[in-house]
Amino acid sequence: MPKQKAAKKDHYQYSDLSSIKKEGEEDQYHFYGVVIDASFPYKGEKRYVVTCKVADPSSVAKGGKLNTVNVVFFSQNFEDLPIIQRVGDIVRVHRARLQHYNDAKQLNVNMYYRSSWCLFIGNDKEAPLEPKVENEDGTNNYFSYTPYNFSGKSFTQEGHETKILKDLKKWSKDYFSNNDVVEQVKKADIETAMKNKTDFDLLAKVTEISDNDQYTNTVSLNDSTGQTWTGHLFKRKFPHLVKGDVLRIKSVSAKEDNSLIFSSHSNILKFFSFSSIHKKLKSSISSDTHIKTCVTKIDKAAHNKMDITPLKKLFFNPKKSEKLFRSQFSVLKVDTKNLEDYVGAFDGKKWHSYKGKKTPKDAELRWNIKLIVTDYKNQQDDKAYMIHLDDNSFFKGINPANWSNAATKKKAEKAFSVLTNNKVNYVDAILERDKKNYHIRHTQFK
């Protein structure tokens, strides 16, 4: 660990956030603040940037509302900026300048104007997530007053700062234990953002993490609005996630199938265990894993690259210019319980009942099945839809022309049992639109 520098003779005077009011080039401020929110470092038009919100005891207004202050870090280099991934950690800043942006107080931290920062843990009982320094003495309280990350090669620290940190941690633990700190996310706001293709935030619980390769993994999440999401993450950017974590996910967008899109500024933040919001999310969000086995495969590579369209959009607002769509659904049941009704005779114009009878002239025995399905990805859509299965190539090795054969029927019965086991299985299929109906095409049962 780089050595701590001796304190300068003219020591730093730290300001309460509410007392910072004078705006000017010559006015520089030093302060401590508890992190309420933060972006990941990202490249702006000319510089790398981190935006965050901080608070201290002076930020509490009448009624207990927290008036946070925006802090923006600027640098020519990514490495000079703080990576903040926990609500409640503490940031110390030297030489910030005040400006008002959109009528809000903003403290600018310009690393190329000799500004500096340090990050401290907000709870002595929980280790730092990504420490820049090692715990050299091996004690549990090593990071209580030692920053776990800082700008530059070294940091200065004076004796009176120990009390500042101690008091700030005491206040934040009390405030966070009795207040949610971050705003609840509304389902309507998410829907509006997705419609407008803009960013939104989530409060969510990790239900599953699976490795893709040495660089990435896939995470499944249940959120506070009852929706399920998936995301592909870089392990290096978010290395500390584990199953069961409750999180604030900042500034993401999403595709229609609820797969999240993480931009360079998107961030994932944890909460301290004493936080009221942590306890509420932990108990209120389901831990059930919404991962099932796909029992089908799409037979063309080009079709596999198609975006997944929610069933609700297919049936209520489809793209009129397109005929083929890709969708994922769970089969609740077949429209008829009688296995004999699964096969019909089609003469090219209309269907004829078969039921073991002789096939009408110029007619072909085909599957004639109506599947009652629900959307696999979009759990918030509680509607049931009808999908038609009349493609003989869907079940490999089961030919409707052999329907009178007992072995064929037994094989079909087993396949349908798997297909309709919606608790553990789902279908990924290409659907062809025929007026208001959708038929499975270019898809095979595994």
Curated annotation (Swiss-Prot):
This is Telomere-binding protein 51 kDa subunit. GO terms for biological process: regulation of telomere maintenance via telomerase; telomere capping. One of its GO terms (cellular component) is nuclear telomere cap complex. Its main location: nucleus. Keywords: Chromosome, DNA-binding, Nucleus, Telomere. It comes from Euplotes crassus. May function as protective capping of the single-stranded telomeric overhang. May also participate in telomere length regulation during DNA replication. Binds specifically to the T4G4-containing extension on the 3'strand and protects this region of the telomere from nuclease digestion and chemical modification. Monomer. Gene3D superfamilies: Nucleic acid-binding proteins. Signal peptide: none annotated. It is found in: Nucleus; Chromosome, Telomere. One of its GO terms (molecular function) is G-rich strand telomeric DNA binding. InterPro entries: NA-bd_OB-fold (IPR012340), POT1 (IPR028389), TEBP-like_OB2 (IPR053979), Telomer_end-bd_POT1/Cdc13 (IPR011564), Telomere-bd_alpha (IPR003415).
